[in-house]
């Protein structure tokens, strides 16, 4: 007994979950589709058919009201599914009613149910020819007008929606890259864009169901009339006139009770797909737009009045329309003349009051990176072609993240009327870090050898590197390229300048919050390293200062686990950030040598002579790791001249070498060189990878 009861007990949760799912509506659609399949197979009694026909009529009206009252098509994304299910439901009802008409038609007009009989008598009014004509008119209106029109609208909407997707996607990415929207807002917009394309694509296909339903209704009606007369006359020996009258009444009633919901849902489909360009609900939009123009209303009033005066034409209907349109036109004219009345809330808002003080927090907020454009450069972001600038900024974010492991903050772009017409300014934390001018419609041309461009144009200096350049006309592009010149457009000039400024200020832009984010985004396999290091061995602030020091010398922090391991190795022996950085750089030897190698794969170096090594070592003063450089000014000038001469000779030979020093003096040599040659790389002997191939090109 216990074993027998076990299956029943185990089945109880599944039955309960099935009932709960039905109550929540999760299985309603599945059961509905199963019910439609049952209609196709099992005979349905007339009372049950009456209930199902009432559900069909009521449901179609509900769908139409929903289509009218929604504000945008995406509020009714389930409409294609609803369209398919209701079409199948009507076809199932047609088959069930056909079975009743042909099998019980000899019993009289009530053989197929009270609903079909009532519709048949209501439309025919004792004359079945009238019913046939009305039914044919409904079929023609539904098939030729409503269904065909809504299908065409759905087809065009789907095509244009799919064609516009790339542009809309680019606009979302541009707003995200410039900081106009957040990552969450971008996700919401992308999801809405995907829903829109899917919806209109589904509507394009679903409209074909409505068209097929109209054709099927016409064919089923003809079959019912012809088949019913044959069955009544041949099988049941009914007089031909009685058979024709009885079966026609039931068939027309069946056709009407099926085609009226079909027509209503076809109208709903047209409403949904035609709302793409309408703001708000359809009733408010139509009321506002049709009655807003007094000139149009006046012409309608005059036209109706003229028609009312035609001999034989009934005066009252047209005169009433003329008076109504004229009164509405007069009211619109008067409303336009008098000032708009304010409601109490508006009056309270308009009353003189003390200006609302802006929150202090809004004044404290600053933009990490900002580009200000002169009035003449607004087309760089407002025109369709202007997306090139935002696209390049987005690509720059990816490049900096890939090369340096540095996530560039959002760039805010805005206009500044105080700038020159075609000028721009780049600000880092609200401070101007660079400025320049570009020429829209022209191209910047530069000689890679550093000479002056021998083409007509405006000779200037390239803003990022200060090289000689010339703004040339666009039609000289091919000639400039043929001569071997470098040619770039205005957006690229601005982006290149922004790139160099960001590289110079990466250390300042790496905030404490950004460091915390980098640590959190490390793989799970590295979480133990972070937990062991922070805060037990070093603080997050110390890690931030180490990363800033590396970025200041343009060393990539992408290999963050390796950097943390270097910090963890040196931290027990020193608290000096300088010494921590030196230890980390030694662990990054492979990366440093690879990043600074020449075209031939060798690392070009300029060595520091023994005299200068000794001079720097003797000039270090202070206890422990907190040493300071105290080099006499005269010796400092000699060193600067020596560095310049050595690197200029290397540049003439086509080399871009690094300065190689001993580990003890490297940070102090770098602190001097960054003042006059910020991009020069200074490496110590500990940072040379054992497999690196060196090429000495000079000595200081």
Swiss-Prot record:
Name of the gene this protein is made from: flhA
Transmembrane segments: 27-44, 48-65, 76-93, 129-146, 218-235, 256-273, 306-323, 364-380
GO biological process terms on file: bacterial-type flagellum assembly; protein secretion
Family: Belongs to the FHIPEP (flagella/HR/invasion proteins export pore) family.
Record keywords, A-Z: Bacterial flagellum biogenesis, Bacterial flagellum protein export, Cell inner membrane, Cell membrane, Membrane, Protein transport, Transmembrane, Transmembrane helix, Transport
Organism name: Caulobacter vibrioides (strain ATCC 19089 / CIP 103742 / CB 15) (Caulobacter crescentus)
The keyword Ligase is annotated on this UniProt entry: no
Classification via InterPro entries: FHIPEP_1 (IPR042194), FHIPEP_3 (IPR042193), FHIPEP_4 (IPR042196), FHIPEP_CS (IPR025505), FlhA (IPR006301), T3SS_FHIPEP (IPR001712)
Keyword Transmembrane helix listed: yes
Subcellular location(s) per record: Cell inner membrane
Name of the protein in its database record: Flagellar biosynthesis protein FlhA
């Amino acid at each position: 007994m216990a074993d027998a009861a076990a299956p029943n007990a185990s089945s109880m949760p599944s039955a309960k979950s099935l009932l709960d799912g039905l109550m929540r509506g999760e299985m309603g659609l599945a059961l509905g589709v199963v019910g439609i399949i049952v209609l196709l197979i099992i005979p349905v009694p007339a009372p049950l058919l009456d209930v199902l026909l009432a559900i069909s009529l009521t449901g179609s009206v509900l769908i139409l009201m929903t289509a009218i009252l929604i504000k945008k098509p995406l509020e009714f994304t389930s409409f294609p599914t609803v369209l398919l299910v209701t079409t199948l439901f009507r076809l199932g009802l047609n088959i069930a009613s056909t079975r009743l008409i042909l099998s019980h038609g000899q019993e009289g007009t009530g053989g197929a149910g009270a609903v079909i009989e009532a519709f048949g008598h209501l439309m025919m009014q004792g004359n079945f020819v009238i019913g046939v004509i009305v039914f044919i008119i409904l079929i023609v209106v539904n098939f030729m007008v409503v269904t065909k029109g809504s299908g065409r609208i759905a087809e065009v909407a789907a095509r244009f929606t799919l064609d516009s997707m790339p542009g809309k996607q680019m606009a979302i990415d541009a707003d995200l890259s410039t900081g106009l929207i957040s990552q969450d807002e971008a996700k919401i917009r992308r999801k809405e864009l995907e829903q829109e394309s899917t919806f209109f694509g589904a509507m394009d296909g679903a409209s074909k169901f409505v068209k097929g339903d109209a054709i099927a209704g016409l064919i089923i009606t003809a079959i019912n009339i012809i088949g019913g007369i044959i069955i009544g006359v041949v099988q049941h020996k009914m007089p031909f006139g009685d058979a024709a009258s009885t079966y026609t009444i039931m068939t027309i009633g069946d056709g009407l009770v099926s085609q009226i919901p079909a027509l209503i849902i076809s109208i709903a489909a047209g409403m949904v797909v035609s709302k793409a360009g309408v703001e708000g609900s359809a009733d408010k939009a139509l009321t506002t737009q049709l009655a807003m123009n007094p000139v149009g209303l006046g012409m309608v009033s005059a036209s109706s009045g003229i028609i009312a005066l035609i001999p034989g034409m009934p005066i009252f209907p047209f005169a009433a329309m003329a008076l109504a349109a004229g009164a509405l036109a007069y009211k619109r004219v008067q409303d336009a003349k008098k000032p708009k009345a304010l409601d109490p809330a508006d009056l309270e808002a308009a009353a003189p009051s003390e200006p609302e003080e802006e929150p202090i927090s809004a004044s404290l907020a600053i933009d990490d990176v900002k580009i200000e454009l002169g009035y003449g450069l607004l087309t760089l972001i407002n025109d369709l072609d202007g997306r090139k600038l935002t696209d390049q900024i987005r690509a720059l974010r990816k490049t900096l993240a890939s090369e340096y492991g540095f996530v560039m903050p959002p760039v805010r772009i805005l206009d500044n009327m105080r700038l020159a017409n075609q000028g721009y300014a780049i600000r880092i934390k609200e401070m101007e870090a660079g400025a320049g001018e570009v020429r829209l419609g022209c191209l910047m041309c530069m000689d890679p050898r550093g000479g002056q461009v021998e083409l007509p144009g405006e000779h200037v200096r390239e803003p990022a590197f200060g090289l000689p350049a010339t703004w040339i006309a666009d039609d000289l592009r091919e000639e400039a390229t043929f001569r071997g010149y470098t040619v770039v457009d205005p957006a690229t000039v601005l982006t290149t300048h922004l790139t160099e400024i960001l590289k110079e200020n990466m250390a300042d832009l790496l905030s404490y919050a950004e460091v915390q984010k980098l640590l959190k985004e490390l793989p799970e396999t590295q979480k133990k390293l972070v937990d062991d290091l922070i805060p037990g061995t070093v603080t997050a602030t110390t890690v931030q200062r180490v990363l800033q020091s590396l970025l200041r010398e343009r060393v990539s922090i992408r290999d963050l686990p390796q950097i943390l391991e270097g910090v963890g190795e040196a931290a027990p022996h020193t608290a000096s950030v300088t010494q921590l950085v030196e230890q980390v750089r030694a662990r990054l030897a492979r990366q440093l040598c690879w990043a600074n190698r020449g075209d031939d794969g060798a690392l070009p170096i300029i060595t520091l002579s023994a005299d200068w090594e000794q001079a720097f070592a003797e000039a270090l003063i202070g206890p422990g790791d907190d040493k300071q450089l105290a080099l006499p000014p005269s010796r400092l000038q000699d060193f600067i001249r020596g560095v310049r001469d050595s690197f200029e000779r290397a540049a003439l030979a086509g080399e871009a070498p690094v300065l190689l020093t001993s580990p003890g003096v490297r940070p102090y040599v770098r602190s001097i060189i960054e003042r006059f040659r910020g991009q020069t790389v200074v490496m110590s002997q500990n940072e040379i990878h054992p497999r690196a191939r060196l090429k000495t090109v000079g000595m200081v």
